[in-house]
Regions:
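Charged, low-complexity terminal tails
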Residues: 1-120
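N-terminal assembly/transducer modules of large multi-domain enzymes
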Residues: 52-54, 58-81, 96-107, 115, ...
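Loop/turn-to-beta-strand initiation segments
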Residues: 95, 99-102, 203, 362-366
Length: 427
């Protein structure tokens, strides 16, 4: 079972200065880091926040509007996201949107490189098992659920009012009782309803909903039952995590009336789930949490351009403004007598490592991979099939497009937040 580690670490920025970060990392059973986020303790992330934004200008030839969510921050809004938008101020009844209009928007992508943050008018209210959407008013069900499960949820949820909102049933829903899912949907309904009622009392640039800290959001987005324990060595963070799970971090002892800190809690099992979650405050003066999980060395490896494979081959990752290029090198381990088998074996090993690195480093956008040339077409088919299987484990939408005539493999990975590399860039 995986564990989530949340700690502090000083990391060298690209200008060589050290800065303190909150490191939230997912580790597998073998204590291998498989996901990581770096957040400055004082960072105020915009991702997921809902604002009353004001339209600054509309550019029809790129089907976009530029919306201010604060006097200092302008965001990109695609006009394709305006269906069922909730306007608080509408200046034109004939045009879909004009400068001066005010509407509810949600930040769906952080500022990346030279691009402004992106917002959408299709608001999302995410729970553990379902997502309520204000613009897309249909019932969607996770593609990872089987036909029987999809049919069950269509029947179960037909009574919900999809004229006012849409629903997306997450993969995690299959791990809980129907009553738990329905209760969460009712809670999301109420949240959206209250926001619509209260917005008339708010002014432009008001923050209507503030997203949870990155380290809490990352944990919530893990598959149900995939994380057995959340561990931190920061008492303040531990108390925040406990409160997020509805647990007060201080408990009354049986022989006294003064609440005292407790270092570990078992999150009550939700009806219908088999696995529970342990919240742990770690404190050991002889061995820090960072040392126990080799956080610093794992991060150093995650920033290296070249990665060596067990076979002696290597992969090299290079970033450009437009895309990421990954090159697979065979090294000196090719045995001529078994050339075809060796080439396929090295490429399969590289494909597994590349899928791991994309998730670990949060590399997104267009990715071009130059595998070693294979000697048979059927081997190319095997490589692509296995690579797709490895990419399916990534919680972020990742698609293997195809292999080009030049033998380059095209992959796209959805852009949501900064890559690990961009986290170290100075603002």
């Amino acid at each position: 079972m995986n564990k989530y580690i949340i700690t502090h670490e000083k990391i060298k920025m690209q200008n060589r200065e050290e800065q303190d970060f909150i490191v939230s990392a997912l580790y597998n059973q073998g204590k291998k880091m498989i996901e990581v986020s770096l957040t400055p303790p004082d960072e105020d992330s915009l991702l997921g926040n809902i604002y009353i934004g004001r339209v600054e200008n509309v550019v029809q030839n790129i089907r976009a509007a530029f919306v201010k969510i604060s006097p200092e921050q302008t965001c990109y809004l695609s006009l394709d996201d305006l269906k069922n938008a909730h306007f608080t101020k509408k200046l034109s009844a004939r045009k879909e949107i004009v400068a001066g209009d005010e509407l509810l928007v949600q930040v769906e992508r952080e500022a990346l490189k030279t691009k402004e943050p992106a917002v959408t008018a299709n608001l999302s209210f995410a729970g553990k098992y379902a997502v309520l959407t204000s613009g897309n008013r249909r019932l969607g069900i996770s593609s990872k659920l089987n036909k029987e499960q999809k049919a069950h949820y269509k029947e179960l949820l037909h009574e919900f009012d999809t004229e006012s909102y849409g629903l997306i049933i997450r993969t995690n829903a299959a791990s809980v009782a129907d009553e738990t899912l329905i209760a969460e949907i009712r809670s999301l309904e109420q949240e959206w309803s209250q926001m619509r009622e209260n917005v008339c009392h708010k002014t432009c640039y008001s923050v209507l909903k503030k997203a949870r800290p990155t380290y809490l959001e990352d944990v919530k987005n893990q598959r149900e039952g995939s994380v057995s324990e959340i561990i931190t060595d920061d008492r303040g963070l531990f108390e925040t995590i406990c409160m997020d799970y509805g647990i007060h971090p201080k408990q009354f002892m049986t022989n006294g009336s003064v609440p005292v800190p407790v270092d570990q809690f078992q999150v009550p099992t939700i009806s219908g789930t088999a696995d529970s979650l342990t919240l742990t405050y770690y404190h050991d003066p002889m061995l820090t949490l960072s040392s126990l999980y080799s956080v610093k060395s794992s991060l150093e490896k995650a920033f290296r351009e070249q990665i060596w494979l067990k076979s002696g081959a290597s992969i090299v990752l290079q970033h450009t403004e437009a895309l990421t290029v990954i090159d697979v090198n065979s090294g000196k381990n090719i045995i001529k007598k078994e050339m075809r088998e060796n080439l396929l074996r090295i490429n399969l090993e590289a494909a597994k490592e590349i899928a791991y690195q994309l998730r670990l480093r949060n590399i997104s956008g267009i990715i071009i991979i130059d595998f070693i040339n294979l000697l048979a077409k059927e081997d190319e088919a095997v490589l692509l099939k296995e690579f797709r299987t490895y990419l399916k484990d990534d919680p972020v939408k990742t698609d293997l497009i195809d292999m080009t005539r030049l033998g380059l493999v095209e992959v796209t990975r959805k852009k949501i937040k900064k890559s690990l590399r961009d986290s170290l860039k100075m603002n």
